[in-house]
Amino acid sequence: MTNTKYYPEVSSNADFAAIEREILKFWQDNNIFQKSIDDRNGESEFIFYDGPPFANGLPHYGHLLTGFIKDVYARYQTVKGKKVERRFGWDCHGLPAEMQSEKELGISGRLAITNFGIEKFNSHCRASVMKYASDWEEYVTRQARWVDFKNSYKTMDKNFMESVIWAFKELYNKGLLYESMRVMPYSWACETPLSNFETRLDNSYRERADKAVTVSFVLNEIPAINGMTSRESGTTSSGDYKEYRILAWTTTPWTLPSNLALAVGSDIDYASIPKEDICYIIAASSVSKYAKELGLSGEENFEIIKGSALQGLSYKPLFDYFANHPNSFKIFAGDFVVEGDGTGIVHMAPGFGEDDQILCESKGISLVCPVDNSGKFTKEIPDLEGVQVFDANDKIIIKLKEQGNWLKTEQYIHNYPHCWRTDTPLIYKAVPSWYVKVTQFKDRMVELNQQINWIPFHVKDNLFGKWLENARDWSISRNRFWGTPLPVWKSDDPKYPRIDVYGSIEELEKDFGVKVTDLHRPFIDELARPNPNDPTGKSTMRRIEDVFDCWFESGSMPYGQAHYPFENKKWFEDHFPADFIVEYSAQTRGWFYTLMVLSTALFDRPPFLNCICHGVILDATGQKLSKRLNNYADPLELFDKYGSDALRVTMLSSNVVKGQELLIDKDGKMVFDTLRLFIKPIWNAYHFFTMYANADSLKGELNFASQNVLDIYILSKLKIAVNKIEESLDNFDTQTAYHAVSEFFEVLNNWYIRRSRARFWKSEKDADKQNAYNTLYSCLETMAIAMSALVPMISEAIYLGLCHKRPDVIARKDLSLDEAISGNSHEIATALSVPRNDGSISVHLCNYPNLSSFEINHELVATMDNVLDICSNSLFIRSTENIRVRQPLATITIISKHNDKLKSFEDLIKDEINVKSVIYRDDLENYASKKLSINFPMLGKRLPAKMKEIIAASKKGEWEAIGGGLAICDETLNSDEYKLVLEPHVHIKGAASFENNSSLLILDLELTAELIEEGYARDIVRFIQQARKDADFSITDRILIEIISEFDLSKIIDNYGDFIKEQTLGEFSKNFTPDYVSKVELENHQIQLKVKRS
């Protein structure tokens, strides 16, 4: 009679990468992703915003990490019954695209691009920006992330761009935009300013060595000392000085040709230091740093001048480039001047310093900026014209020495901002730009931020919250080419000023009388019209050349993707704000921030309600992953080797989801460990079920009605795990969710299945056996659904393998996993399309398990967990003492207050840890004592002054446990400030505590001859079972056994022969031709085993 097999033949040594490829094909062939959206009616939606990446480079591990997190919560919310649209998006504009195009075209700089032709350059950008789009789709699909590529949005699409210019005009109409010439971080390599938050991206600050120079400025007036000039004060040196010089220190010598003022601190004490016939003025606190240069011994006393007394003095210009600049070359007080580095005097070049500009403009000094867009000096500095500013430092220092203004040059190592695209050092430079008045509504952003749930929580009030509190106005214009143009037209004649701002294509077409098919440069630049405010009709309205900062476009994603407000108005209003977004932590200065600015300014709402800030992935040595360093493997290689589920678990079960770093090795050992320790146990449980169910021709059913104590226990643990996964994912905590899965399968495999083997092995197909199959089936199917977001492909494979409820599949007697999920034949495809009872053909179309009708037996769980604790501790003692598990021991003594409950599991304990008897006691004090362990970091924060006293008392045992706390030194310690550890008395061997240090077990480690003999018998059983497996016998095959040994086993066979035969389905025999022969070793003696199917 042929066995009916209801389940696929599942290999215990599965090729998970191959399984995943089959699952991906099943999803594609059956359009499962789209079904997961269509099956939800939309009454309840989970709104998710997908931050747009650039497609001009391949995805890296950081992208995959973000993608895994996005996919987990999208899948989870789907099985929770919500509709989750997942529209992909592409960031297309900005420096990344332009820099790549310049490289590919072999040109560099604004002038070269203009000569090449803006239209041709932007056409190249348009083509190259999607260069890796197909690769992105391959990576994203292979990582089992479901997204809608077909309807993806692009920031370069006309509709998206129109929404961006709408937002600009809205801000303009609200009075939240202004144009200004301000000092900003400036990338001379990209020839464009950067916003202040761009300098905080991706560790843009790094260590750099610069030449710092100390320069002397010659005063035109004699400073007052104690309200008098030195001559009036009667000091001995009065009148002896040829010059008074004030010393300033700077790390940017190249800005000195643009010096227009000096700043001092009003309340700072300055010393007047004579050297020959010159008196130098410097902050008193800095004198010692210049002892050598000023010829000081360290014993001198100096006249002190308050900074306020220096205010208003004038000085001679260092150079004559701007010598006639109005209101310049004076000393002013600045609240930003502090003592420390330098001289306590700050040189002011308002074209290259933000504080400089603010102070100088307040004193009527207009800025000068003799540096061009490429960071080179202009003709205003004729002897340095065309020299790059950093290359000019040495030339300027030489000139200072020649003039007699130089005092000192030193190497200064400091953290300095670099361009996030070119890695070149930035300069600070005055440039014209359009700004969003963020400072006008930053307090409102701080308020709205309180409505957002941040993960980790501290981001809310620290990393992001502090950034919002200190927000500055945002420069949103860039003098570049490939981007959404600022919709601003100005009169080209200042006599007839006029500014027009446009917020739609319709407005443009109405005013300019042309059909607008492309908003990009140069087409938009060609739109011009007569200035309505010019009665002469000679001036023209022309567009300013700037384009938007691409971060403005990214921040416009919520409405830009919907072409709001021109289309989809209702859709946008129903899908704003987002329920969830995720990116890495630096986006608190990037995308998260720009979303917040625009959402607050335009809608007075937070842009998202839940946000995960994950950490970064580094190599095994803590270095950034880099192609140049060749320190990481192509993710596709890992997928092909271990599968993407394993990488997903590796990443999302680590601290990287809590904003910390994850170090990943190039060879993928960490991913292999995840496969071995997390994925394989899940698969092993599934393999066990299918193997034995097929052998018995039995089907499992979803059934929670068994009264078997092990079944009730594991089903209770199942519900606990399902609830914990749900609770964790509701709280955006994948770490805890993965731990719940791992913990459950640890108990399922190493406790439930192992303790239930006899029920699966026995030949009788009774109710107890069916209950065992139903229970294991229920665990597997329920967990497949519960963990489907966490391990989407392995869950799907298991779910499809358990498809025996479908009539078409039941008819197949030899259905394999590959056949079940490949859809290679009409019959199989039909089978996979037959709905389950809940209408689901895929695990990802199911509803999250609802186990409300099953009550957890908490008392049983607590007791069984104690039993498990007893057994695991006993096995650990065996391992420590080098006593193998198959070697029986005489007794275990259990000392506990819950012996009555434990006694009902005595046979289980004896069998599991292989002891002959259990002794119960309750006199714990005779065997162990409690030792107090202090949590020093925790308690030290609360009671730092009493720590020594508490430590001494704890060592003396001068404490008392009271209620939920502990009394010591007139203080009551909280539960998280201490732990009571149960320590066995020194003379007791083989002991361990359990039940939270409230109980003790003691194993009798003495081995008698009878015990040793029985241990050998169990070893022989193991040898035979391994031979059966190696011979590829079925688990139901009966066999013949012959044992040939130099070791006398006759007594063992006589005493334990029946036990050996029962355990191995065998009979002892001789003179047969074996199917398999193995050689093993027992106590250093060789044994030959022969086995044959009988």
Swiss-Prot record:
NCBIfam families assigned to the protein according to its UniProt record, in alphabetical order: ileS
Protein name: Isoleucine--tRNA ligase
Substrates-to-products reaction catalysed: tRNA(Ile) + L-isoleucine + ATP = L-isoleucyl-tRNA(Ile) + AMP + diphosphate
Motif range ('HIGH' region): 53-63
Family to which the UniProt record says this protein belongs: Belongs to the class-I aminoacyl-tRNA synthetase family. IleS type 2 subfamily.
Entry comment, domain topic: IleRS has two distinct active sites: one for aminoacylation and one for editing. The misactivated valine is translocated from the active site to the editing site, which sterically excludes the correctly activated isoleucine. The single editing site contains two valyl binding pockets, one specific for each substrate (Val-AMP or Val-tRNA(Ile)).
Source organism of the structure: Rickettsia felis (strain ATCC VR-1525 / URRWXCal2)
Motif ('KMSKS' region): 624-628
Matching CDD domains: Anticodon_Ia_Ile_ABEc, IleRS_core
Disulfide bonds: none
GO MF annotation, one: zinc ion binding
Gene Ontology biological-process entries: isoleucyl-tRNA aminoacylation
Subunit-structure text: Monomer.
Stored InterPro entries: aa-tRNA-synth_I_CS, aa-tRNA-synth_Ia, Anticodon_Ile_ABEc, Ile-tRNA-ligase, Ile-tRNA-ligase_type2, M/V/L/I-tRNA-synth_anticd-bd, Rossmann-like_a/b/a_fold, tRNAsynth_Ia_anticodon-bd
Enzyme Commission designation: 6.1.1.5
Lineage: superkingdom: Bacteria
Cofactor(s) named in the record: Zn(2+)
GO cellular component, one term: cytoplasm
Keywords, in A-Z order: Aminoacyl-tRNA synthetase, ATP-binding, Cytoplasm, Ligase, Metal-binding, Nucleotide-binding, Protein biosynthesis, Zinc
Subcellular location: Cytoplasm
Record: residues binding ATP: 627
Protein task: Catalyzes the attachment of isoleucine to tRNA(Ile). As IleRS can inadvertently accommodate and process structurally similar amino acids such as valine, to avoid such errors it has two additional distinct tRNA(Ile)-dependent editing activities. One activity is designated as 'pretransfer' editing and involves the hydrolysis of activated Val-AMP. The other activity is designated 'posttransfer' editing and involves deacylation of mischarged Val-tRNA(Ile).
